[in-house]
């Protein structure tokens, strides 16, 4: 399996200053470094990736589909009219925009998604703060599989879907031995946390979403990592084997054993030693 990770060194200096927009404005704007960074991403893919892809109308259509999937793969927020407008505007034009270092289409689509998501989550919280009728058995059929559902044809259809979905979620929690009040409080907390996460999304998140929509066209194992994502990746890697009884850290491109914890599984086995470098992880009998 070929894995190709692109690290955004150019953005590392500016990411610390990225601020999430206020919920009221619901606008995320890319800065002047992002087009340059995106050009570097395309150059890296063209020069180093084994898959060669032309920036043409086929690429444009794929990119639009992948980006919309990343934004709202569950078909929870966009309306059919939003999708149709996006396809009309950008299906055959994203490639032309990228050739001109124009990331405004990504900005436009991301902010529309953000606007729809914030409005929907706020509406869900408002609904949950009033008593919701639990659906009767005959009325509980709801299709959660986005592949089997169409986009909402109207705000009214979206409202009806979400009212039923919230009632289903409440019912599910009550079946798990929550009282109606406890279920209501728990769901409100979940949606408030979700609202906070969306409010905190910033230009780095926008850029990463669009960049990864591009890299996914090349292959599913090609990823763009922002400096923050790279840091989280390193943290996760450094902690991934601590359960075996060893303290680990990232050293250059390898995970290195800092020390073996006395009495732990690694100490009992006697194979792993301090300063060993871990180049792969596998189950017993597997090739690494």
Describe the predicted segments one by one.
Residues 1-9:
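Bacterial N-terminal signal peptides
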Residues 12-288:
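Flexible, low-complexity junctional segments that flank or bridge functional domains
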């Amino acid at each position: 399996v070929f894995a190709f990770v692109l690290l955004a060194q150019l953005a590392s200096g500016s990411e610390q200053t990225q601020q999430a927009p206020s919920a009221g404005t619901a606008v995320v704007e890319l800065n002047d470094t992002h087009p340059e960074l995106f050009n570097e991403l395309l150059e890296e893919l063209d020069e180093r990736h084994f898959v060669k892809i032309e920036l043409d109308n086929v690429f444009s259509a794929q990119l639009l589909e992948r980006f919309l999937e990343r934004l709202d793969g569950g078909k929870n927020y966009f309306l059919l009219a939003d999708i149709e407008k996006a396809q009309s505007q950008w299906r055959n034009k994203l490639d032309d925009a990228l050739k001109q270092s124009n990331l405004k289409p990504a900005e436009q689509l991301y902010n529309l998604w953000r606007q729809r998501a914030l409005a929907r989550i706020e509406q869900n919280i408002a609904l949950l703060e009033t008593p919701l009728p639990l659906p009767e058995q005959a009325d509980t059929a709801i299709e959660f599989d986005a592949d089997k559902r169409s986009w909402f044809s109207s705000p009214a259809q979206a409202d009806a879907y979400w009212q039923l979905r919230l009632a289903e979620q409440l019912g599910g929690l009550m079946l798990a031995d929550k009282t109606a009040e406890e279920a209501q409080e728990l769901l409100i907390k979940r949606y408030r946390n979700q609202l906070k996460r969306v409010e905190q999304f910033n230009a780095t998140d926008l850029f990463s979403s669009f960049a990864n929509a591009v890299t996914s066209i090349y292959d599913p194992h090609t990823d763009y990592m922002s400096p923050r994502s790279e840091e989280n990746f390193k943290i996760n890697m450094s902690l991934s084997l601590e359960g075996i009884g060893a303290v680990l850290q990232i050293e250059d491109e390898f995970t290195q054993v800092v020390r073996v914890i006395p009495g732990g599984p690694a100490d009992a086995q006697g194979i792993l030693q301090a300063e060993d470098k871990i180049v792969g992880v596998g189950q017993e009998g597997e090739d690494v």
